[in-house]
Amino acid sequence: MAEKPLFHYDEARGRMESVRWLLAAAGVEYEEKFIHTNEDLEKLRSDGVLMFQQVPMVEVDGMKLVQTRAIMNYFSSKYNLYGKDMKERALIDMYSEGLADLNEMFILYPFDPPGVKEANIALMKEKATNRYFPAFEKVFESHGQDYLVGNKLSKADVHLVEMIYNMEELDTNILANFPLLQALKTRISDMPTIKKFLQPGSQRQPPVDEKSIQKTRKIFKF
């Protein structure tokens, strides 16, 4: 039996949370070795297992993969969440890269100083409701299918629903004008493995709070 993938990252959402969502959708079990201190991180660096001295890192299939998008693409290919041909993969990548822009803002805003944080929350909500969510709603309107590409679940659908949940933490009514995105959220949330992932006690990480912010700052020294 193949070993489970092993994640190395802070015990937080950060850049690993999208990978957690993806493997939940694929129904794949994994293990996590959390980095709790700067010393834990420095040991990984001194052991030479972090190609660019950065985490996340995933041990899988004899590899030590770094760079979140490379990790996502590998698992998407392995578990058939990456389209059937080059054209479908191009669309999946295009949608995923757009979502990555919004996700980057979401990952970083908790570390902003007061004033800046509130401004960035307002900016994220504005971009979600006026740029990103309308674009994806239009995709579903254009083809009338259940999923973004090829009428089959892909990493783009999973990442979109992850971002919907993230943005709903900032505004519970943010999907009010996007019925097709509401339907996608329900569809994916009802998948047994995602339903389990959304329950308390799963490997899904909770929203960032002040304690986790301070811990992350100490680990990464910023």
UniProtKB/Swiss-Prot annotation:
One of its GO terms (molecular function) is glutathione transferase activity. PROSITE patterns: GST_CTER, GST_NTER. Gene3D superfamilies: 1.20.1050.10, Glutaredoxin. Glutathione binds at Y9, R45, Q54, V55, Q67, T68. CDD domains: GST_C_Alpha (cd03208). SUPFAM superfamilies: GST C-terminal domain-like, Thioredoxin-like. Keywords: Cytoplasm, Transferase. InterPro entries: Glutathione-S-Trfase_C-like (IPR010987), Glutathione-S-Trfase_C_sf (IPR036282), Glutathione_S-Trfase_N (IPR004045), GST_alpha (IPR003080), GST_C (IPR004046), GST_superfamily (IPR050213), Thioredoxin-like_sf (IPR036249). It is found in: Cytoplasm. Its EC number is 2.5.1.18. GO terms for cellular component: cytosol. Residues 85-208 form the GST C-terminal domain. Its main location: cytoplasm. One of its GO terms (biological process) is glutathione metabolic process. Homodimer or heterodimer of GSTA1 and GSTA2. Conjugation of reduced glutathione to a wide number of exogenous and endogenous hydrophobic electrophiles. This is Glutathione S-transferase A6. The gene is Gsta6.
